[in-house]
Every structure is written in structure tokens, then in C-alpha cells.
Regions:
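Acidic, metal/ion-coordinating pockets
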Residues: 3-349
Length: 349
């Protein structure tokens, strides 16, 4: 089952500048290289300064909260006969990035039994149509639900995504995506539940080794963790330990999910850790916090992260994220995320 991918909408970035032997060297030939943004800059409501930089030197990664087209979400798309429905209000954002990254927390299989309850997840394989519509480029399957229907379903999901042009984080080693001469490596790790076949599980030695391998192949290394305790504002010590481990091993950016609430960011050794983006496509309508999430927009200048913007969303109707347009509500979510960031008690090395 193959669906045609939507064309990415960021056309100014399509100029190929990688004509020299070292595209990275060319990227850094400018005398001006912006720094990692401060906490105040990250949580401001003004990121328009990026437009003053050369679009040819910029690459953007979009990361969402948990994507779970199972249970009520799966029922909705079947009812509407529209697998694009969850993404109709946000696809213009996710498509407008060089790389759109998700945590797909359910297998997508042919014979998914419909249900609106329970903790054993699956989604109809046609849900891949919505992912293609949303412009998803990379999916991490390193989580505690993708294996709910066994190793065969994990492989079926992996094959389905690959057939539709979506890269999948590997059980061993990085997956690489080249964006106009700058190579991004993605590594996904699950730290929730017991180890599952076909899923990359957290192991400190393995993480260090694979980050080292990724550093040899790519200019930018992104580590994706499924971690933490659900329904908490703050990361636990285990999350902080694993986040620091990845940065110490050479990661440039750490992306987290699983708690189903938004959690703070941390700047550690001039690198960024986002502990959790909240929910994105899920049916947890029973509280305000589980209906909220942020889309993380990570902008790189060459191999350097120079801007981070969080775009608040709210889920409606058991599975469709909508951008929050009310300025007060949007800033309330950002201010709360900033407050939790400032409260974060850092692990001292």
C-alpha cells in the first residue's frame, strides 16, 4: 500500500549548495554563526529573525508529541473514511520542514481489530496515508506499544512505512537522511516496559557505541528517547541521566516523548534536550494536559542548532490536533513550559 508523498512546501531551501568537497565547510564560511538560543529566546513568541538568514544555510527538523492512530483515532478515520483527518489542521506545519519526525506508538497492520478501549494498540494500515499527507519523513518505533501485536506486526509496520518513503529508526545503528549535503542521523531508544523483539531498547553501552558510529556518518546526530513517567510535569532522574549520556556521547539534540504531558527543556553542555512534547495524535480527551502538546521546530545553521520554537496544539474530537491561535492561551502553555524548565533541578556532573 503506497501513497504519493506531499511535496514539501519550503521551496526556498531547495537550492543545492553542496558543490564543494565539504558542504559543511561551505556552510560555515560566513563570519556570522548564531549561537544556541537562550531559554528566554526559546519561549518567546517571536522567531521571525530567522528570516534574516540565508535560507540556503538553514535546515529545519519538526518533532511532534506522541502519534497513536489507534483506539478512538482509528475509529474516527474509519468512520470518516479519511485517514488524513488527524492531520488536516497541522499538515501545513509538518510539511513545511526539511525533516518531519514522529514517535509512532502503535503498529499499523492489515487486520487491526477495531476498539476504543484497552492498552493493546494497533491501527489500520491505511493510516500511513495520513502520515504521508502530513509529510512525515522519519518515524521512531522505539516505544512500548509498537510491539503490542508481536514482531511480525513491527516488521509489517516498518515495511509499510519504508514503502511509503518514511525512514524508520533501526534496532541497531542510525538511519541517515541527507538534506542538501548535511547528513542527519537518527537513533531511537525505548526505556519503557520490558525489552521487546524488534524494538531498540535502552542500553548505555549500545547508545554510546551507536552515537559514535553515527558521528562517523553524519554531521548532526539526533537521539529520540521514549522515557519517563506518565502525567508528570518534570523529568525524573533516569531521563536526565539518559539525556546527559547521549549528549556526552556526542549527540547534538535529544528528543523525548511518552509522558503524554508537556515537559521542559534543558540546555546541557550547549546542547538541547526536550524531555517531552506531550500528545499530538491520541484520544486522551479526559484532561486538559493530555489534550495539549507542542510541535518542536528545530532550526539548524549548517550543523549548529540556532533556533528552537514550540508551537502549541490542542487535540479535539478524540484525535485531531489543532494549532492554538488565541495568543493568551498559546503564551500560557509556553510560559508554563518555561516555568517548568526554570524549575528543573539539573544533575551535577
Amino acid at each position: 500500500m503506497i501513497f504519493q508523498n506531499q511535496q514539501k512546501t519550503n521551496q526556498p531551501n531547495q537550492v543545492n549548495i553542496a558543490n564543494s568537497n565539504s558542504p559543511l565547510k561551505k556552510e560555515h564560511s560566513d563570519s556570522f554563526i548564531p549561537n544556541l538560543p537562550s531559554i528566554d529566546q526559546i519561549f518567546s513568541d517571536n522567531h521571525t529573525w530567522i528570516a534574516t538568514l540565508s535560507a540556503q544555510r538553514l535546515r529545519t527538523v519538526i518533532a511532534t508529541g506522541d502519534v497513536i492512530p489507534a483506539r478512538s483515532v482509528n475509529s474516527k478515520v474509519l468512520q470518516f473514511k479519511d485517514f488524513n483527518w488527524p492531520y488536516l489542521e497541522t499538515a501545513h506545519v509538518t510539511r513545511n520542514a526539511d525533516i518531519a519526525l514522529i514517535n509512532l506508538e502503535t503498529p499499523l497492520i492489515k487486520n487491526c481489530p477495531p476498539t476504543q478501549t484497552g492498552m493493546i494498540f494497533c491501527g489500520d494500515e491505511r493510516n500511513v496515508e495520513g502520515l504521508v499527507y502530513a509529510g512525515v519523513d522519519v518515524a521512531s518505533l522505539a516505544n512500548n506499544h509498537v510491539g503490542n501485536y508481536g514482531i511480525q506486526a513491527v516488521q509489517e509496520t516498518t515495511n509499510l512505512l519504508n514503502e511509503n518513503g518514511i525512514l524508520v529508526t533501526e534496532v541497531d545503528g542510525p538511519v541517515i537522511k541527507d538534506i542538501r549535503g548535511i547528513k542527519f542521523a537518527f537513533l531511537g531508544y525505548n526505556d519503557i516496559s520490558k525489552p521487546q523483539p524488534g524494538v531498540s531498547n535502552v542500553d548505555g553501552g549500545k547508545i554510546k557505541q551507536e552515537i559514535a558510529q553515527a558521528r562517523q556518518k553524519a554531521d548532526i546526530v539526533v537521539v529520540i528517547y521514549h522515557w519517563g513517567v506518565e502525567y508528570r510535569n518534570q523529568p525524573d532522574e533516569r531521563q536526565k541521566y539518559l539525556g546527559h549520556l547521549a549528549i556526552d556521547a556526542g549527540a547534538d539534540l535529544v528528543i523525548g516523548n511518552h509522558p503524554h504531558w508537556i515537559q521542559p527543556v534543558e540546555i546541557y553542555k550547549d546542547k538541547l534536550i526536550t524531555y517531552a512534547h506531550g500528545n499530538f495524535v491520541f484520544d486522551q480527551m479526559w484532561s486538559e494536559k493530555t489534550k495539549e502538546g507542542v510541535i518542536g521546530k528545530y532550526t539548524f545553521y549548517g550543523d549548529k542548532l540556532i533556533d528552537v520554537e514550540f508551537i502549541p496544539i490542542k487535540i479535539i474530537d478524540f484525535g485531531q490536533p489543532n494549532l492554538i491561535t488565541d495568543p493568551r492561551t498559546r503564551m500560557s502553555i509556553l510560559n508554563d513550559m518555561k516555568e517548568q524548565t526554570l524549575k528543573l533541578s539539573y544533575v551535577k556532573d
